[in-house]
A protein has these predicted regions:
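Acidic/histidine-rich catalytic neighborhood of metal-dependent amide-processing enzymes
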Residues: 1-18, 83
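Metal-dependent amide/peptide-bond hydrolase catalytic core
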Residues: 18-263
């Protein structure tokens, strides 16, 4: 992958999935809200639970164990070391929707989108169950539905190839042959440290390990995560610049990357 790597060689990153939570209620006139069942109010409790799931510790001191638990061998015995390298999973509410007859009525439905970043040891099934097991979702079990979004946008031909909005975590050992090939080429060309065109570039590179991982998601989730084709990353630019309104890519990075690609056997 040639996504930005800040002068580093990246051997994996967290996966992600897109979750939808639907809450049903009963509408009524806003002058007597007690006659209805406000779906937005019920969803508000779910929103707070999702915040807690992302932010809480996992030491048993809170009702909801936070996602940091996957860095602990007690919760993630097979994959905790990879999880510590990739970083813990996260979740955040990214969208909210509602239906209501008017601004003077109780909302009869509310839905949210949840952006879920997944570390090693997490599956889409486990992530859905975490949401289903939130106290608020259990409290309103008969009125709540937790699901995964499906991608169904038509192609230019009009054909629809429906697929789940789930993009698997992927990681390689540093000793993997395709990773080591890039490391060896970098060592031969420029040594063991990240390089950059100027001080602005080096300000985010200096002191960081040459071999690392992305924080965001790349096409590696399909190349290796979904299809098992070995993938490794070395690309021009910086992660912090990606999708920014003033995004830049250093010309020297383009030259550096082209040289390394040419040097890889």
């Amino acid at each position: 992958s040639t996504e930005p790597t800040d002068g580093g060689i990246y051997r994996g990153h967290r996966g992600r999935m897109e979750i939808r939570v639907d809450m049903h209620g009963v509408s009524c006139h806003g002058s007597a809200p007690e006659r209805g069942d406000n779906a937005i109010h019920k969803m508000a409790e779910v929103l707070l639970n999702i915040r807690d799931l992302n932010e809480n510790p996992a030491d048993g001191s809170t009702e909801i164990n936070g996602l940091v638990k996957m860095l602990d061998p007690k919760f993630n015995p097979e994959h905790y070391e990879d999880a510590r390298f990739l970083g813990r999973g996260t979740c955040t509410t990214s969208q909210i929707f509602y239906t209501s007859p008017s601004r003077c009525a109780v909302a009869d439905s509310c839905a949210i989108s949840v952006d879920r970043r997944m570390t090693a040891g997490e599956t889409y099934q486990s992530c859905l169950k975490e949401i289903e097991d939130l106290p608020a979702c259990k409290k309103y079990a008969k009125d709540v539905k937790v699901s995964m979004y499906m991608y169904d946008r038509p192609a230019w031909t009009g054909h629809v190839y429906e697929t789940e909005c789930f993009f698997p975590t992927w990681i390689n050992k540093e000793s993997a042959p395709h990773v080591q090939a890039l490391i060896d080429a970098h060592h031969a060309l420029w040594g063991t440290e990240r390089i950059g065109a100027d001080e602005k570039a080096m300000s985010t590179r200096r002191g960081r390990p040459l071999t690392d991982k992305w924080t965001f998601s790349t096409n590696g989730v399909s190349i290796q995560g979904r299809y098992g084709i070995p993938c490794v990353g070395f690309g021009p630019g910086a992660e912090s610049q990606a999708h920014a309104p003033n995004e830049i890519t250093w010309k020297q990075d383009l030259v550096t990357c082209a040289a390394l690609y040419a040097a890889v056997p």
